[in-house]
Design a protein with these regions (language model features):
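Negatively charged
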Residues: 2-165
Length: 165
């Protein structure tokens, strides 16, 4: 059985450490990962296995992360409400994230803006609660089907695909 400490670390065995991220700690950990992946992995575990179930905002998390291309498809996005600028200017990222539960997200503005490599299927995303998709794919190479998306609650789609290929 694991015990959760005040800092979010949970020790399951002598070798396994799981960090339960919150809004404040996820941004710090991502910055540490960008600076030194090995050191961050020793501290938090591999980024692909991070417990993001308590995170509600991913705003600017990988903004301008030009070398980031790690698999993060196992992240629990079920409580996230804000994905603004998450991969904006992340020019190398092109990982599968189509299985994410984004059903609580209300803003996706500039999510993939200037993400010049990302072109993965995300048609299965439940975007029915999204209100803002402004410039979501602007200046990107994204070319996937989105015809199953329910965008009936979106209030702002300004420049959603501006300058896209």
């Amino acid at each position: 059985m694991s015990k959760l400490s005040k800092n979010g670390l949970s020790k399951i065995s002598n070798k396994t450490v799981i960090f339960k991220f919150k809004n404040e700690t996820i941004a710090i950990a991502v910055n540490e990962w960008m600076e030194n992946p090995e050191k961050a992995e020793a501290k938090y575990g591999h980024i692909s296995k991070w417990d993001t179930s308590q995170v509600t905002t991913m705003n600017r998390l990988f903004f301008k992360a030009t070398l980031f291309n790690e698999p993060i498809d196992e992240w629990d996005m079920s409580n996230v409400t804000d994905m603004s600028y998450m991969f904006s200017n992340a020019t190398t990222f092109n990982q599968s994230i189509g299985n994410w539960d984004v059903s609580k997200v209300t803003t996706m503005k500039y999510l993939f803006s200037n993400a010049t490599t990302f072109n993965q299927p995300i048609e299965e995303w439940d975007v029915s609660n999204v209100r803002n998709m402004e410039s979501m794919f602007s200046a990107s190479v994204f070319n996937q089907l989105l015809n199953s998306w329910d965008v009936s609650n979106v209030l702002n789609m300004d420049r959603m695909f501006a300058f896209s290929n």
